């Protein structure tokens, strides 16, 4: 046996047709940063604590129900970022051609007995010593983060069924370049500004592995709840504009947009929050220059909505991916 090198690792992903049924061959391979990749099978511990006349707490350990989690992240690539975005939101409508426009919003339904849950995904993990697939994974956390002089980065979290060993695939990675933050623009209340320096957008949904009694350890369903979108943005404080937006509850439209290239190979990642409620604004003097750090909470609205209902955020992603991944 040989000690395995971390840098041999890679992960792949594919949308499942049937939740919990593994897709043998990934449709995309996602470049990730090594220390962000954290797959884990989690058993509920069951302990026999029956008294037996001794100063012992536990006598037997039984593995209870099982689910798994898979965290990963890294630099944002305008094609593979679709998977966690669509996984959290549930709706990906494709239009145009070369580059294709993916409009991602919160999946809703007004139809009785409809399934409003997002799609589930199979995640493949090659970790040198072996290969495993993690099935039925629902994305529930996504964080986009940026600093003016760095790369656009993200973290994603998913929950699903237990892992299983798999065959080694032949990976094929994106040729798209990661996104440099300096290529972006920031718009507040319809006006483009140039004094925003750092920020993040966090999309979170509660997730619950639901267990039935059917002689299996795996969940009956991995269920995600309502979406909340929050974030922070730092501005150089040249005037009171952003502070006033907070004090007067203006709730300005916030648009963060990154576009690279032209023509058929152009890529774009744009987040729009039409009702960006400022929940806090702090004047910051830890540097040689004054900043104001704003916390925001995106409110549900019809402008950012998809096919049905409300949505607090809408993403537009342009790339060469021809089909929906939701």
PLM region spans:
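Signature of extracytoplasmic/envelope-associated structural regions
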Residues: 1-326
